Curated annotation (Swiss-Prot):
Subunit architecture: Heptamer of 7 subunits arranged in a ring. Interacts with the chaperonin GroEL.
A Gene Ontology molecular function term of the record: metal ion binding
Chaperone is among the record's keywords: yes
Entry keyword set: Chaperone, Cytoplasm
GO cellular component, as recorded: cytoplasm
Entries under NCBIfam families matching the protein: PRK00364.1-1, PRK00364.1-2, PRK00364.2-2
Protein name: Co-chaperonin GroES
Length: 97
């Protein structure tokens, strides 16, 4: 994938969610709902502050993150793969191993 987000934007690939129904049936994809976890594929250079300085992002490529899947998060299809473009402020947490 050849994409470079600008400023404080982050490209995230949503992780598939797997859950079980009350009867123990494993649900995947749309039946399980949309995951709010994903892997960071690319990051911008950082947020531009009022004084003109660039603040580097806290997330890095490869991080697994939990994000707010709402207004401001844009889904795009790039190289036949759906990715999400969001601001770093849409990321709520980094999952640490």
């Amino acid at each position: 994938m050849n994409i470079r987000p600008l400023h404080d934007r982050v490209i995230v690939k949503r992780k598939e969610v797997e859950s079980k129904s009350a009867g123990g049936i494993v649900l995947t994809g749309s039946a399980a709902g949309k995951s709010t976890r994903g892997e960071v594929l690319a990051i911008g250079h950082g947020r531009i502050l009022e004084n003109g300085e660039v603040k580097p992002l806290d997330v890095k490529v490869g991080d697994i993150v939990i994000f707010n899947d709402g207004y401001g998060v844009k889904a795009e299809k790039i190289d036949n793969e759906e990715v999400l473009i969001m601001s770093e402020s849409d990321i709520l947490a980094i999952v640490e191993a």
